[in-house]
């Protein structure tokens, strides 16, 4: 249910309540029994003859009837306690909200501020050099490419004392002589399994216990192109994947409302939904509603791409009500702060925007640090030039100042800042192709190579990283994108927009991109950014968001099936059995969109009796292939031995239980052909006596067979 704690709020009630025939359940991991990991259980009909099906759940508390949703107060901040338990962080006052944070909007157009305020957390600095608790000196290096790791990633760091421990008044979380750990990558490299790692391992297993025989069979049936999908996900496997940089848990320490999830090629393929206002349309109310709506249908993360007024306020409302990771493109807001003129952008303005969003709790930033001055001319002969908003902003800045991008030259500082809050990098593809004519050109791949260099720097700084990819790519050029990304970026998770496989279908680009998304997900892409029917045409509304999410859930699931993910096919098989058994309600409920499935069925067969009918409106009652198959099975089960023998002979197959002698005669002495003719004549007569009807009730057939036996 929804309530409003403040009667003056303009926020509408968001969509709550379970999906059809579903309920929220919670798995309790053995490693941390205090954790409650959410799953959605699809309740099957009484006649199903099989257990209910648990599936991955992204909906947060919004589908839990036991939780009262109050968007004005926000969700419970359960994860904040986990962060504080680990130590190595401090609570502080944070920066004040400035007028430019909301685009200097006037009072008449200002959105209502979020009512609750939470002091932000940040990672503690290392003890000063020369003190008893000072860390070893960092490796020398300057600018991009010069950073080194304090401790090699292969060297285990000391285990932290309980509750983060303290020595001589200095907080630490990785031993008294090293700087405090903050990020999931740092903990993973230290051999420490966090609660977030335990949580996501349980989610990935979809509530199943170890079923190794079936899991290994599924893996053997798939083609993973070199991925290392496990038969069963353990917290240790999660830790090892994060330590290697092959997976990330985007989880800002200030996003206490978050239900952790993992992004990596060896886990379930995830999808992202984009929302956000613009200078000409949408509002805070609509964007919060779209976020809740997107996760209801399966979005694993949401990016707030707001570019209009009230950006800070919109983001605060979204974050405080978001159980999933929230990403942003900070350059959008920075541009609003300088009146939309890219030439006026400065490093100081951008850095202040990063701090603002880190304190709010944004989980990952798209940063277009790979758009270098030397690459811009490579786009001159493109059909569609630079289509990334962030890429075009930085390209214009570079040309106007004829300098290297400040995102590139200050990358070390960006890493240091993001590490303090465990904000993950989503290294942006500012030079991605905007048409299939530009796919895989030198500009695109030059930027990708630079992103690989930046990935290593971010890793050395302790930051989690994923890489953004295209874009518009025809089918035959998709795999090279995946292969090159894995090679250049050290297997960091890949996150792509589609790709769109053709440019001829405005209004249907959720389909043109869904095709490419399924393929690149199969090849190893870890997260797919959805495309809606409004792509290239306008800002998506609520219905467009749903269509985009469902389309990409299909693509992600198809890629998981192809990779041989151990649990992926459980839902397919359950729905197939329901379809064959004519359990219509189970068919609807096992689908990704039960409401639409039932609505389509009911357009032509609206009566309740049709929900149990053994046919649909496509074939009708007399031509349903599955009904015919069921009749054949029932018929065969009731045949006597003589009838089976006759049918076998007529079809040229073996006689089964009725033996045949070497002389070519049946055991009762009759010639085989005579026996067959007699049996066929008997069945012909039976057909006439039963009314010469092609389709018969199965029970009547069984009764008739008893008389013949």
UniProtKB/Swiss-Prot annotation:
One of its GO terms (cellular component) is cytosol. Gene3D superfamilies: 6.10.250.620, Radical SAM ThiC family, central domain. Binds 1 [4Fe-4S] cluster per subunit. The cluster is coordinated with 3 cysteines and an exchangeable S-adenosyl-L-methionine. It catalyses: 5-amino-1-(5-phospho-beta-D-ribosyl)imidazole + S-adenosyl-L-methionine = 4-amino-2-methyl-5-(phosphooxymethyl)pyrimidine + CO + 5'-deoxyadenosine + formate + L-methionine + 3 H(+). InterPro entries: ThiC, ThiC-associated_dom, ThiC/Bza_core_dom, ThiC/BzaA/B. Pfam families: ThiC-associated, ThiC_Rad_SAM. GO terms for biological process: thiamine biosynthetic process; thiamine diphosphate biosynthetic process. Coiled coil: none annotated. Its EC number is 4.1.99.17. GO terms for molecular function: 4 iron, 4 sulfur cluster binding; carbon-carbon lyase activity; zinc ion binding. Residues 1-21, 125-168 are annotated as: Disordered. Substrate binds at residues 274, 303, 332, 368, 388-390, 429-432, 468, 495. Zn(2+) binds at residues 472, 536. It comes from the Bacteria. Residues 1-13 have a biased composition (Polar residues). Pathway: Cofactor biosynthesis; thiamine diphosphate biosynthesis. Keywords: 4Fe-4S, Iron, Iron-sulfur, Lyase, Metal-binding, S-adenosyl-L-methionine, Thiamine biosynthesis, Zinc. Its cofactor is [4Fe-4S] cluster. PANTHER family: PHOSPHOMETHYLPYRIMIDINE SYNTHASE, CHLOROPLASTIC, THIAMINE BIOSYNTHESIS PROTEIN THIC. Catalyzes the synthesis of the hydroxymethylpyrimidine phosphate (HMP-P) moiety of thiamine from aminoimidazole ribotide (AIR) in a radical S-adenosyl-L-methionine (SAM)-dependent reaction. Belongs to the ThiC family. This is Phosphomethylpyrimidine synthase. It comes from Rhodopseudomonas palustris (strain BisB18). The gene is thiC.
